Amino acid sequence: MDLKKFVLEGNPVCRKEAVIVGDHFRITMLTTALIRFEYSEDGGFEDRATQMVCNRDFPVPEFRVSDGGEELHIYTKDLEIHYDRQKFSPSGLMIRVAGGKASERVWHYGDEPKDLLGTARTLDEADGEILLSHGIMSRNGFSVLDDSHTMAMGEDGMVEPRQGNRADFYFFGYGHRYVECLQDFYRLCGKTPLLPRYTFGNWWSRYHKYTETEYKELVERFEKEEVPFSVAVVDMDWHLVEDVPPVYGSGWTGYTWNKKFFPNPPEFMDWLHKHGYKITLNVHPADGVRAYEEAYPRVAEKMGIDPASKEPVLFDMTDPKFIETYFEELHHPMEEEGVDFWWLDWQQGTVTKVPGLDPLWMLNHYHYLDSKWKGKRALTFSRYAGPGSHRYPVGFSGDTFITWESLKFQPYFTANASNIGFGWWSHDIGGHMFGYRDDELTARWVQLGVFSPMNRLHSTDNPFNGKEPWKYNQIVETVMKNFLKLRHKLVPYLYTMNRRASRAGLPLVQPMYYLEPEREETYEVPNNYYFGTEMMVSPITDKLDPVTGLASAKTWIPQGIWYDFFNGRAYKGGRKVDLWRDIYEMPVLVREGSIIPLKDMEGYDNSIENPEKLEVLVYPGESGEFVLWEDGGDTPEDLDENWVSTRMTKTADENGTVFIVEAAQGNTAVIPQKRSWKIRFCNIQDKPQEVTVNGQVYKDAEFAEDKKLHGTIVILKDVPADAQVKVTFAADAAVYQRDYAEEVYEILEKAQITYAQKTEVYKVVKELGTEAVPVLVSMNLNPSLLGVLMEILTMGI
């Protein structure tokens, strides 16, 4: 094995024109707001890539240097740097960031960062909030990323300790330009790779002693119940655990299939593949390879150990020979048999033979890059190992408690990870262990999972703990099934956002303050987040109110007009509100003019391939555009020639509303040559004036009422992918008008209050409409009921 394949991509050497250097210091001007500072007593500086940083080849920014003799002054449009040329100290290195209050925008070396935080290594045993590590966004406008203690990357693909006791850090002084800050972080530390398409479907996972027969029966039950999954996660009991001879210790680490449970592993994995599942196996590699393992003889021989000695092969990711053997003799053979990627469940600390080198980082780095060996797209599944870990998706967040407190923390935890570029977390949806059974909690957690980077249902080894929808009450079973189907419908949208995350440096999930950093309210709703270009999500993390039968989520609605994803209800933005929903829905809002492509699913369909049938949601607004991006889904490299784009636009003016699907452009071989389109126009209640394909009237168009979105559905079948579709509505097409009294009636009908109060409230609303608010406020109503009524009567357009 050539270990050079493990060298990080990028050019770690900066441009000479960007450098200001002295006998013991070097300052590198990467951008006008991103500066590298190094100090070395021995006068040596680091030009190799590190575990954190792989590219310093930035265009030289504009800057000015004023040499004041003993002091050095550097100016850019964003920063003033004042440095005394000595060993870095609070009095000797000061940076002022442009804009904001002067007292808040000044940093002295050694100041404790006051940033918006980033993420954490794991949520293991978390029962609510945990401490997070630092990120690169700050309301003060600056942050520091310390790279002094990471290893350097050698040309041979191995990591090496850095020489001397040198200071090496990066100053980010972007003010509130959070998105620009993040994009330059990716340029410095490597981009987020493109994920395989199948990762965006649902994942099934359970710590349970499955047998091959039981697992197949489960998959067939999912098919019968029409519950789609695309990834089968097989936890540790795939290998020998309890049957390991005591002389070898525990069976926590293992590489030998348990043939009692899985008598024919290749056949089992082939069966799963034929049923549309990719496969990942759990592995705890810390105990190395012991003599009972089937692979032991060949592993021992390759490591220079006599197999007859039964001497264990110790786990050591600092040994090139072990790395080669580990992959070629343990993992590659099982990948040949059908394993698609590995769940690296490392829980054994941060110590290796090399001081300061974290074995988790080594596993993530080498596993991810090695996973390309079969000509497929790289993927691993493991815990976070510090800044730069975004290069090794997907993240496994660990073993959380099954409690409302755990659920309440996860939306914030997920969104906040974008502050250190970590955009692809996978949580134990529904929680892993301990806690309690609460069907409503499970339903809300699944809803969050569907609107999360990954949706992986999981539970621990307990006969009472499982996430099969049919194990819950009928209402929650329905909710789980509906949302799991929705996740697979969302794959076209999610995969387009996957491309955006990799190429544009824009994570799928982003905190609300990214786009409105000067609005105080955006910092007050940590559980709200943007979900791609078109949506914002406000998960419900509290129990249903007993009076209304609804639960609420504190929500900041950004400026503009927003529409409920599920029912089309319109909201005026620019305010913070409580949004109330029953168990069947959650607050997901889409901006006006949004176009959202979905897979059109009928019955059971767990395929994540580029769909033949597409469903497109079109929301009101003057204009909108969405470019659907598709490729082969698992090609090893992200090349322009792999992609096909389908541009969709919507315009609405005094002449009417026009929606166009342009002819597909690019590598059309990767999509169906003919497609059917189900286009759902929210709030437009007339049939189109005209439907054309390539300019010719399409007489076979079908029309239906869209009761969910109070609009019209237009259906076109078997349209060539290289054809243009155009749907035109007349300027006077009927538009849905909300019936506020009817909406209030539906709330009152279910409310657990006196009939007299129901009648009184309804009478007031019938008479006064949206002007009823002052009267309702004076009626001493239950606070929850009043909150629901306020949402209906005050937030519409």
Predicted regions span which residues?
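Short, well-ordered beta-strand segments enriched in hydrophobic/aromatic residues
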Residues: 27, 35-37, 74-81, 536-539, ...
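Surface-exposed beta-strand/loop patches in extracellular or lumenal glycoproteins
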Residues: 36-42, 545-558, 667-687
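A low-complexity, Ser/Thr/Gly/Pro-enriched, surface-exposed linker/loop concept
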Residues: 5-6, 30-69
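Catalytic-domain carbohydrate-binding cleft regions of carbohydrate-active enzymes
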Residues: 2-4, 11, 81, 93-585, ...
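Accessory, solvent-exposed terminal regions and/or long lumenal/extracellular loops of proteins
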Residues: 593-696, 719-721, 728-797
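Generic start-of-chain signal for non-secretory N-termini
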Residues: 1-22
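Solvent-exposed beta-strand/loop surfaces of large extracellular or lumenal domains
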Residues: 48-62, 305, 563-583, 690-715
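A surface-exposed beta-strand-loop module
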Residues: 71-73, 79-80, 702-724
